[in-house]
């Protein structure tokens, strides 16, 4: 029987399925009960498609606000909170016959670089690693997580073996996968690699095939996106005695045990389990509740909120978000939906993308023309690739916001939670939503209008030393 695997961060991302907010929203809602419902909901919708294994959740910690890949994909920078919420999310998945995967061992979120582009480093000392990432992985192993995905990340305090003078990533490190993870940490589940196409993995050997074989030898049981030649090559090298049969036996035992654990060996198993109307309603309610409980008021020092049609009728909404890879303008299009939500609620809205330097004369008058100027900042991972800071036109919008009368300015981040203190520390009203989707927009409007209270608590330290001078 086959394992069918998907990524499915933020819910099952297909039409007709239920979108969930980013993982950090779960951290802001800070409810183990909702974490379980999140996992269960994703599992039920996965089962309706025949999916029995997800590469989720992210178990990395946001220790470096400049990390471009973890950010809102992670629940927190706090290991205790991460263990509490992730263990329930995993339980929700696995109680409902979907294998969970935690990633990216030995832990991302320390480096300021992206393992899609290069091999990155978890530079923590042994003591610090055991207090942070090591603790999260160790505790979730004890809780019974089925799979672990190593990242293309090094762990210098532990590693000694080198390839061409450099420490290899975990996906190529026998020390980290077999020595640390399988033996010292007693992980008996399946090790599934991160994508073989990422630059953090490629280029360590003369060709991709040799790297893939080396990854299997290091302790990866299932490779994500290897070449077609990979399996035949492993078979031939086992027959020649170049790869120990014990390595294959270990991988087979782990994969077989996972299939048995999740019922794939049961002859009466349901390949596809439809979601009932009652379950669908519960799933939608879970996503809605997480979203409503996550939106976080970081500060409202001059009491601009709640908004009302009496005092805030005329609004300028400024969309601050870059064009993503190959012209993908998803975040901007979603912000247009948020504009429509304001209009539906009776506001007179002008909407524009960024305020540029050449508009300086116009921007000086903006706070006289409008009751409020709201900067909607959507800076999310890989939209586009690169650091999560603001550049070019978006940076000019920061210039504009900080040049305006702050009594009229509100900043809302629909992505990275660090934007407010990084760029807008003098803006007195600042909100984090963690996600940029229709459900978040709807909840945000109700909260801005005072129909719902702010309930979210920041799951990460916003007063990070990087932003304190």
PLM region descriptions:
Residues 1-18, 42-62, 82-109:
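Glycine-rich, aromatic-flanked loop segments that form ligand/cofactor-binding clefts
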Residues 16-28, 64-75, 114-120:
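Surface-exposed, active-site-proximal loop segments in enzymatic domains
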Residues 14, 173-174, 183, 204-469:
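Preference for extracellular/luminal or secreted protein segments
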Residues 28-44, 79-83, 127-132:
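Glycine-rich anion/phosphate-binding loops
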Residues 77-226, 230-236, 240-250, 254:
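Second-shell residues forming the walls of enzyme active-site clefts
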Residues 2-6, 10-12, 52-57, 99-104, ...:
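Structural recognition of the beta-strand scaffold that forms the well-ordered cores
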Residues 8-10, 59-60, 106-108, 152-154, ...:
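Active-site-proximal loop/turn and secondary-structure-junction residues that shape catalytic pockets
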Residues 1, 32-48, 250-253, 257, ...:
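Active-site-adjacent structural elements in enzyme catalytic domains
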């Amino acid at each position: 029987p086959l394992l069918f695997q998907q990524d499915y961060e933020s819910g099952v991302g297909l039409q007709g399925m239920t979108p969930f907010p980013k993982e950090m929203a779960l951290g802001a809602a800070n409810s183990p009960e909702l974490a379980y419902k999140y996992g269960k909901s994703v599992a039920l919708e996965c089962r309706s498609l025949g999916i029995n294994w997800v590469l989720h959740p992210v178990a990395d910690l946001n220790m470096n606000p400049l990390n471009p890949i973890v950010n809102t994909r992670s629940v927190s920078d706090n290991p205790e909170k991460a263990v509490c919420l992730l263990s329930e999310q995993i339980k929700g998945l696995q109680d409902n016959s979907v294998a969970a995967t935690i990633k990216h061992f030995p832990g991302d979120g320390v480096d300021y670089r992206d393992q899609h582009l290069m091999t990155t480093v978890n530079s923590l000392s042994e003591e610090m690693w055991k207090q942070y990432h090591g603790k999260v992985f160790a505790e979730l192993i004890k809780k019974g997580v089925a799979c672990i995905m190593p990242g293309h990340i090094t762990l210098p305090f532990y590693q000694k073996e080198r390839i061409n003078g450099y420490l290899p990533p975990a996906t190529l490190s026998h020390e980290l996968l077999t020595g640390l993870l399988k033996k010292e940490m007693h992980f008996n589940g399946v090790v599934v690699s991160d994508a073989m196409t990422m630059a953090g993995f490629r280029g360590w050997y003369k060709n991709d095939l040799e790297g893939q074989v080396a990854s299997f030898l290091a302790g990866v049981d299932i490779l994500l996106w290897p070449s077609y030649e990979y399996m035949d090559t492993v078979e031939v090298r086992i027959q020649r005695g170049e790869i120990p049969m014990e390595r294959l036996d270990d991988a087979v035992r782990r994969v077989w045990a996972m299939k048995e654990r999740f019922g794939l060996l049961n002859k009466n198993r349901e390949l596809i389990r439809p979601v009932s109307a009652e379950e669908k309603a519960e799933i939608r309610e879970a996503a809605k509740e997480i979203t409503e409980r996550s939106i976080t008021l970081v500060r409202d020092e001059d009491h601009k909120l709640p908004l009302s049609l009496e005092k805030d009728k005329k609004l300028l909404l400024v969309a601050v978000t870059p064009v993503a890879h190959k012209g993908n303008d998803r975040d901007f299009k979603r912000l247009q939906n948020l504009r429509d939500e304001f209009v539906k609620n009776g506001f007179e809205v002008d909407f524009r993308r960024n305020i540029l330097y050449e508009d300086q004369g116009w921007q000086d008058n903006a706070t006289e023309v409008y009751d409020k100027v709201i900067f909607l900042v959507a800076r999310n991972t890989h939209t586009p690739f690169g650091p999560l800071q603001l550049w070019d036109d978006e940076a000019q919008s920061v210039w504009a916001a900080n040049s305006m009368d702050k009594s009229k300015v509100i900043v809302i981040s629909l992505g990275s939670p660090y934007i407010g203190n990084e760029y807008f520390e003098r803006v007195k009203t600042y909100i984090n939503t963690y996600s940029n989707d229709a459900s978040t927009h709807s909840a945000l409007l109700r909260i801005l209008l005072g129909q719902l209270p702010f309930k979210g608590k920041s799951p990460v330290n916003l007063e990070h030393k990087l932003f304190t001078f």
